[in-house]
Amino acid sequence: MSGNSTQSEMMDRLAEAAWNELATTSPRHIHIDDVAAAAEIPAAAARAVSGSITALILHQLAMLDRQAVLESLADIEDAGDVSIREKIVEALMHRFEVYAPHKAQIIQLDAAARRDPALGLRLLDSLGQAMRMMLRMVGDDVAGLAGEARVRGVALVAMQVARVWKTDDSADLSTTLKEIDARLTRAEEWGRTLRVLRDPHSDAAMHDTSSEGDADGGDAG
């Protein structure tokens, strides 16, 4: 096994161990030595590889987000010809399904982020990266300022829906799905910042630059 592979495997194990502790412990009370012991990795090596507990948490979030996107891609490809909006609904919904077993960790992170603005910014950046990856998966190149606005707009939708998801006890997360649809509809009504939600089969183009699009442009955030 190469050095890079060993480091990657160690990081995965440490991230999983930290994530498990996060279910019942605030991030600021998680100690790297305890995480290392749970992952069966020497403490010195754990400190060298991980850097910080926050880095381990972000690593685990990234792995879950990649899992959600890849699984959504497979589902979307099996579904055949569907609109970009439907793809986004499917991808957002599946992301909440992937995170469903980890609600305790998300609640801990939300509480910690309110106390620690630096952590909050790191988590916002992580969410932005996840939404950027998701939009690229559904066919948006997220290029330029308009693309970044769409990323932020969908990230805002995800944050708003998460408030409902955290208390959604339905087996199929039907309440969450309704909230996704409602929030996306509202975002569309706000303007063309989320032009990626427009179906290219029923509109001129996903990145329409017509005068109508310019006139309707707004801030989804």
Cite the ranges covered by each PLM segment.
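Helix-turn-helix
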Residues: 2, 13, 21-59, 63
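Short, leucine-enriched amphipathic alpha-helices that occur as contiguous helical runs
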Residues: 7, 11-19
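Amphipathic alpha-helical interaction segments
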Residues: 13, 34, 90, 108, ...
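Hydrophobic alpha-helical connector segments
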Residues: 59, 73-108, 125
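An extended, acidic
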Residues: 96-99, 104-122, 131, 154, ...
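Amphipathic alpha-helical packing segments from all-alpha helical-bundle domains
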Residues: 117-140, 148-159, 178
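Inter-helical turn/loop segments and adjacent helix faces that build the functional surface
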Residues: 140-145, 164-174
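C-terminal peripheral helix-coil segments that are non-catalytic and often amphipathic
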Residues: 167-221
